[in-house]
Amino acid sequence: LPESWQVHYKDLTFQVKPMNFKHTGLFPEQAVNWDFAMDKIRHAGRPVRVLNLFAYTGGATVACARAGASVCHVDAAKGMVAWGKENARLSGLGEAPIRWIVDDCAKFVEREIRRGKTYDAIIMDPPSYGRGPGGEVWKLEDNLYPFVELCSRVLSDKPLFVVLNSYTTGLAPSVLGYILQLLVGRKFGGTVTWDELGL
């Protein structure tokens, strides 16, 4: 098995390499979300600013940038952000309008709110459990609701979409849908849908 290799999806290219915990740096089941985001961005009829939180190696970041969006990619792991930059470069998007941020996602969103920054779309893929760069503890069951509420405050007046992914076995997709409906749907309108992804 090679140390790393490239995978192509449509006009996107990703570097894949086996890591601990059976990760490869790519979640191919997310392609349905990449397609959704690219379609929304391409048909928005306006410039789109996307905030990608817990952005990992940047699959969604690269897809949104390919569709023409300005993207802010945030992950607490420096190595994942570097990998995301490499995926953008491999996809011919090395000079695309992407901000690469190594930070705790909640703290970053709080600062963006104070700065008056807004985004037309948010993609988030929070872990079940994790630690931020400053040792901050994240537990999805405890932190998701207040985190989505916080994120709703950085959305523009006419948001295009919000995508929330979770691999936490204890939370049904309907629970995530309910949280989005309560905190985003009621505030901005639109349609909230949920489903399970698989290969």
Locate each region found by the language model.
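Non-catalytic substrate-recognition/targeting regions of SAM-dependent transferases
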Residues: 1-28, 35
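Conserved alpha-helix/loop element of class I SAM-dependent methyltransferases that forms part
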Residues: 28-46
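Conserved class I S-adenosyl-L-methionine
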Residues: 45-56
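Conserved SAM-binding loop
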Residues: 52-53, 73, 101
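Conserved SAM-binding loop of SAM-dependent methyltransferases across substrates and taxa
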Residues: 57-71
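S-adenosyl-L-methionine
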Residues: 77-123
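Mobile active-site "lid"/loop adjacent to the S-adenosyl-L-methionine
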Residues: 78-80, 102-105, 119-150
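C-terminal catalytic and target-recognition region of SAM-dependent MTase-like enzymes
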Residues: 158-199
